[in-house]
Amino acid sequence: MGDNLKKRSSMTTDGDNRAPNRAMLRAVGFTDEDFHKPMIGIASTWSEITPCNIHINKLAEKVKEGVREAGGVPQIYGTITVSDGIMMGHEGMHFSLPSREVIADSIEIVSNAMRHDGVIAIGGCDKNMPGCLMALCRIDAPSIFVYGGTILPGNCDGQDVDIVSIFEAVGKFNAGKISREEFIRIEQNAIPGAGSCGGMYTANTMSSAIEALGMSLPGSASMPAVSSRKANDCYEAGKALINLIQKGITPKQILTKKAFENAITVVLVLGGSTNAVLHLIAIAKEIGVGLTLDDFDRISKKTPHLADLKPGGKYAMTDLDKVGGVHGVMKYLLKEGMLHGDCLTVTGKTIAENLKDMPDLVPNQTIVRKKSEALHPSGPLVILKGNLAPDGAVAKISGLKKISITGPAKVFESEDDCFNAIMTDKIKPGDVIIIRYEGPKGGPGMREMLAVTSALVGKGLGEDVGLMTDGRFSGGTHGLVVGHISPEAFDGGPIAIVQNGDKVTIDSSKNLLQVEISQEEIDKRLKSWKPIEPRYKTGVLAKYVKLVQSATNGAITNLL
């Protein structure tokens, strides 16, 4: 180990003119020897506000041990997190997607300011993963992402339960399908401890995508948060980063177009969240890779859905981990010719080299099917276009018996109005709900609609109504739902001029989203449309509205 690995930090520590800088570093524990070692930033998203992140600092300490062992000098620093589960269904959800940008900005600021020679970012809750990756792309020093890990399932009356169980219980209780006592028991047992929400929801979707991208160590994505394996994953990541610095490998060499195609394939096979579309496009833009909705559409049409995972399926991430994990799935996909095996990873080796000596999926398991027995012959994430979404929209069809609907529009100007209508039985089978002015600018922040969709499922309407929005959906959502409609209502997209009673069609089999009125009538209504005032005039959300781009561009705020 030598000064030649200090390509960035040398400007902070080397030479007589940097004596004041070194004096400050001595006060935080640096020794004479440390000034000759690469400086490593460890970005921790630890927080007491959410179970997804409450254990992260313990993991950061294990990363620190690995860095020290391999000859680096580690520095743990903090960034923010919010809790999507706790923010869901109220005003706080406006801040979820903007938190992704703050995470990215803050990691970029600290590690570029300190001139860290390498960075390890540790994330737990949903926006941590893309926020961390976006920052690592901007810094483009040798980097690794470590996932905090998935939560263990809760147990209620002998049944596995999780965060979606209690969201759906709200609708069931309102409909009189469960007693108050059962409702309370589900609440008390749904979240047993540390870790991210346990199905193939957004956090686990993004951890899987990041492993497929090659930016985390093999096996990292599916390990439980509370396990010796996860602690060792962190320790090994610390050591692996020094190897990356020695080899001079940075995210720009790893995050190629083929790497993103691998990530999309894995997300589709696993039945991942619609949020993966938004976040992968955002990450790709940060690293300079051209990724669009058309890429998702192209790959989805040839990629089968194989994993029977929640929310549309039966199993949790811990179940997948027991039968071989995400790396086991990737090994199967590589054998089937569905992945680019020559993509470089943070081990310094290729995907194919990493998977060569890793175990196959457990024989005769029922969680991940073979291609010949696919749950669906194409991917569950569907890109729709039409006169309601000229720039595109995203639907998820996993676990659905019905993938199309035509019915009268029930229009709401916010999520809150729609939720109240559901809970007061104003939504009927056959309706197509439209929730607008919830886009990146209009919301602002593209609120997730888990409270709404879970209420529909709890009320028994999940298969009988359609729902479309310029907002987003939680990874825990299931039902005939379409999000990310672009252009959004705030920008004068056609969703802004739909009226109650208009006949509206969602047809996932034809990739179609349209209102059954003439183009002449659409143009007439658009001419008389007037934009709404931004809902926030001061503070971070007011700033966000001025910077954020459309969902088709990943809702990024970087000035690219």
Swiss-Prot record:
Pfam families: ILV_EDD_C (PF24877), ILVD_EDD_N (PF00920). It catalyses: (2R)-2,3-dihydroxy-3-methylbutanoate = 3-methyl-2-oxobutanoate + H2O; (2R,3R)-2,3-dihydroxy-3-methylpentanoate = (S)-3-methyl-2-oxopentanoate + H2O. Binds 1 [2Fe-2S] cluster per subunit. This cluster acts as a Lewis acid cofactor. Pathway: Amino-acid biosynthesis; L-isoleucine biosynthesis; L-isoleucine from 2-oxobutanoate: step 3/4; Amino-acid biosynthesis; L-valine biosynthesis; L-valine from pyruvate: step 3/4. Its EC number is 4.2.1.9. The keyword Cell membrane does not apply. Its cofactor is [2Fe-2S] cluster; Mg(2+). GO terms for molecular function: 2 iron, 2 sulfur cluster binding; dihydroxy-acid dehydratase activity; magnesium ion binding. The keyword Zinc-finger does not apply. Keywords: 2Fe-2S, Amino-acid biosynthesis, Branched-chain amino acid biosynthesis, Iron, Iron-sulfur, Lyase, Magnesium, Metal-binding. GO terms for biological process: branched-chain amino acid biosynthetic process; isoleucine biosynthetic process; L-valine biosynthetic process. [2Fe-2S] cluster binds at C52, C125, C197. It is an enzyme of class 4 (lyase). Disulfide bonds: none annotated. The active site is at S474. Mg(2+) binds at D84, D126, K127, E448. Belongs to the IlvD/Edd family. NCBIfam families: ilvD (TIGR00110), PRK00911.1 (NF002068). This is Dihydroxy-acid dehydratase. It comes from Leptospira interrogans serogroup Icterohaemorrhagiae serovar Lai (strain 56601). The lineage of its organism: Bacteria, Pseudomonadati, Spirochaetota, Spirochaetia, Leptospirales. The gene is ilvD.
